[in-house]
Amino acid sequence: MDGNYRENKQKWAKKDVIMQRNDRKNSIQPKGQDACDVVGLVDDLLKKAVSLAASDIHFEPTSSGIVVKYRLDGVLNTVEKLPRSLADNIVARLKVLGGLLTYRNDIPQEGRIQLQDEYDGKVLDRRLAIYPTIHGQRAVVRLFYEESGLDKLSQLGFSPYIYSALEQIARQNQGVLLLTGPAGSGKSTTLAALLRHILRCFPGKSVVAIEDPVERHIDGVTQVQITPHGEMTFPTALRSLLRQDPEVLMIGEIRDAETARIVIEAGLTGHLMFSTMHSGTPAGALLRLLEMGIEPYQVTSSVTAVLNQRLVRKLCDKCKKPNPQTQLFEANGCGECFEAGFRGRVLIAELVQLDGYLRQAVLAKADLDELEDILKNRGHMNLCQDGMRLVREGTTTEEELNKVCG
């Protein structure tokens, strides 16, 4: 194999990969590369993604080739542009690694990439998704890592108020805690930390988790993986597990009215329930339950609190600098952060606990604006206000906060 790939393989240090964002140079491969070359290319792309702690690898087909991007700290960065002659072979190699049908190019496919762990033992899972487009097949690999240093609830970065409230919720014997936020906002990490907290503080409790799929193994928790298109669905698994004498249940996601009804009823009958919902705000989550057909009195009787969270990029500690006018820190850029000015992400969150005022509003079927007004008048600290705490501390910037909260 000749051409730029050999050169790139030698140059591909961490900084070189990311600096291509600012100095974009197409590293187009020559035609006629054999299968071994593509195997090495894909292997190197996967290795480099892990070395940079990328959360996702995108292989995006275009009219002229295939573009490879890494998602780093929530932001997509182009790292390679490869010729069209390699596109099919690259996707075919990914399919082989994921155990997918290499001869079907016209259907979406999903799988898991199995690799030796000599270079990325910290990776727990690699999920592969293939999708046909007008320019060819698009592939995305999502990487799941061992979350060193994030095992405990106290390590996640919650404000003292939210941390204390979550500790109190974990002590309860029944009720429902809902988590909201987009994909990649740390909900699974928070749920895992909550379960570990309960097991440490209250050993001997029966703790069960129903997930799609199981993302990380938690010692002491009975974990069940559902099959959405088979017989083991969320409602089926949940109904059966309630007869297994559980005390604490974590349900990966409330996706439908049937699951919502079972979760709410379980929260009223001596079970502590944790789950997630698709909603942008805590008030929106409460209304979503009503839209699913849950009676207002059931919502107010079972739901203890709603936790809404996001992740924002964290300023690089090595190069951040204060603005003389605002006395707030700004991004700068250095070798440690690959000239981005940011390194890692940090949690921002808001927690709404159902008090008498909010319960009365839900029972009265108040709309979203009315619920938001009640929270504001009650002095609720919303997501952006929690984020400003981190801006003042010099952990992130107002601009980054606005990207997430805006």
Report the location of each language-model feature.
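Short, flexible helix-loop junctions that flank or precede catalytic/ligand sites
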Residues: 6, 12-21, 25-406
